[in-house]
């Protein structure tokens, strides 16, 4: 959970524009006319520059999912109530429900601002990116995180089970900025152990679990430590690398703190020369190569570094015990769940009402406007607290709940 109180006036306008587009999709009454200068959707606090298409954007097929499509480039006039082209193919009520479930323990503004920053404060490009993400997620991501490891075992998803039991990627504490750390051990990877889809599901489960570790007033992002000890060419698999790049560029923007590549062997050099050409400059800027424990200490404290790497973390990475369901007692309490969900729905409606007033209010920075801002912060906090209450009633407990490292 985090709040951004450092927005400039122009940046705040872009945030309001994105909320206005979402409101029109969700059929929430709001008049955003005065926040679209010259009645154009092309507002940006920085000059828009043409850039090369990322690997992700080259794969897009439908109009509403293309970041470089007409939805992101065409200058059409704003009309009160008119749904932006990038959102036109989305179901209003399904998308609304999904959005408020997906934010979990992050504030609504923090979630949207990640997309805005990724598109350099260009409202059109942001809404195109956000529209694609909403389409991509649908109900899939919530099913993965809420079902957790238990659902994987119950459905006998052998490839995902293999990755879990190898502990190929695990969450191991925090970095020096209190970002959760995902430890990845590529030496354990062999493409024949799972299908591409199973590896993608495992990756999404770990990424979504890491988001539950976010701490209030600290960066809502994750650090990934790739330990290349023992890595050989038999472990190399480009498909999952491309998938991870896609995820962080397109669906988890501004969510990567650092990507630490530790003890890369010489055979990794030609591989790196290929991979680096796929990277968005923002993602590339987060990559750091480390060679020893002292260099790791610049990013992660010893208590969170596994002992085999020279740290003090004694977590057992050789033996995996799957959750047995004994902590899932609240999942059957549908009455309490319904009560907490009703409270959440009421908080969402209050937030939408106050946000519509905040969008429409003029002049800025008068006492009434400041009160609206403060009310939005209060409701955002209440939504985060509500999710903490709701979580045990909708999400099967993970191995991190069992070992006590995760406290939502």
Curated annotation (Swiss-Prot):
<dbReference type="GO" id="GO:0045717">
    <property type="term" value="P:negative regulation of fatty acid biosynthetic process"/>
</dbReference>
<keyword id="KW-0963">Cytoplasm</keyword>
<dbReference type="GO" id="GO:0009395">
    <property type="term" value="P:phospholipid catabolic process"/>
</dbReference>
<keyword id="KW-0443">Lipid metabolism</keyword>
<dbReference type="GO" id="GO:0043001">
    <property type="term" value="P:Golgi to plasma membrane protein transport"/>
</dbReference>
<dbReference type="GO" id="GO:0005628">
    <property type="term" value="C:prospore membrane"/>
</dbReference>
<dbReference type="GO" id="GO:0005783">
    <property type="term" value="C:endoplasmic reticulum"/>
</dbReference>
<dbReference type="Pfam" id="PF00650">
    <property type="entry name" value="CRAL_TRIO"/>
</dbReference>
<dbReference type="GO" id="GO:0005829">
    <property type="term" value="C:cytosol"/>
</dbReference>
<dbReference type="GO" id="GO:0005739">
    <property type="term" value="C:mitochondrion"/>
</dbReference>
<dbReference type="InterPro" id="IPR052432">
    <property type="entry name" value="PITP/CRAL-TRIO"/>
</dbReference>
<dbReference type="GO" id="GO:1901352">
    <property type="term" value="P:negative regulation of phosphatidylglycerol biosynthetic process"/>
</dbReference>
<keyword id="KW-0442">Lipid degradation</keyword>
<dbReference type="GO" id="GO:0006893">
    <property type="term" value="P:Golgi to plasma membrane transport"/>
</dbReference>
<keyword id="KW-0445">Lipid transport</keyword>
<dbReference type="GO" id="GO:0015914">
    <property type="term" value="P:phospholipid transport"/>
</dbReference>
<feature type="modified residue" description="N-acetylserine">
    <location>
        <position position="2"/>
    </location>
</feature>
<protein>
    <recommendedName>
        <fullName>Phosphatidylinositol transfer protein CSR1</fullName>
    </recommendedName>
</protein>
<keyword id="KW-0597">Phosphoprotein</keyword>
<dbReference type="GO" id="GO:0005768">
    <property type="term" value="C:endosome"/>
</dbReference>
<comment type="similarity">
    <text>Belongs to the PITP family.</text>
</comment>
<keyword id="KW-0813">Transport</keyword>
<keyword id="KW-0595">Phospholipid degradation</keyword>
<dbReference type="GO" id="GO:2001247">
    <property type="term" value="P:positive regulation of phosphatidylcholine biosynthetic process"/>
</dbReference>
<dbReference type="GO" id="GO:0005811">
    <property type="term" value="C:lipid droplet"/>
</dbReference>
<dbReference type="Pfam" id="PF03765">
    <property type="entry name" value="CRAL_TRIO_N"/>
</dbReference>
<keyword id="KW-0492">Microsome</keyword>
<keyword id="KW-0967">Endosome</keyword>
<dbReference type="InterPro" id="IPR011074">
    <property type="entry name" value="CRAL/TRIO_N_dom"/>
</dbReference>
<dbReference type="InterPro" id="IPR036865">
    <property type="entry name" value="CRAL-TRIO_dom_sf"/>
</dbReference>
<feature type="domain" description="CRAL-TRIO">
    <location>
        <begin position="157"/>
        <end position="317"/>
    </location>
</feature>
<comment type="function">
    <text>Non-classical phosphatidylinositol (PtdIns) transfer protein (PITP), which exhibits PtdIns-binding/transfer activity in the absence of detectable PtdCho-binding/transfer activity. Activates SPO14/PLD1 (phospholipase D1) by stimulating phosphoinositide synthesis via the STT4 PtdIns 4-kinase. Modulates ArfGAP function through effects on SPO14 activity. Inhibits phosphatidylcholine degradation by PLB1 (phospholipase B1). May also regulate post-Golgi membrane-trafficking events and have a role resistance to oxidative stress.</text>
</comment>
<keyword id="KW-0007">Acetylation</keyword>
<keyword id="KW-0256">Endoplasmic reticulum</keyword>
<feature type="modified residue" description="Phosphoserine">
    <location>
        <position position="2"/>
    </location>
</feature>
<dbReference type="InterPro" id="IPR001251">
    <property type="entry name" value="CRAL-TRIO_dom"/>
</dbReference>
<dbReference type="GO" id="GO:0046488">
    <property type="term" value="P:phosphatidylinositol metabolic process"/>
</dbReference>
<comment type="subunit">
    <text>Forms a complex with 2 TSA2 subunits. Binds phosphatidylinositol (PtdIns).</text>
</comment>
<dbReference type="GO" id="GO:0008526">
    <property type="term" value="F:phosphatidylinositol transfer activity"/>
</dbReference>
<dbReference type="InterPro" id="IPR036273">
    <property type="entry name" value="CRAL/TRIO_N_dom_sf"/>
</dbReference>
<keyword id="KW-1208">Phospholipid metabolism</keyword>
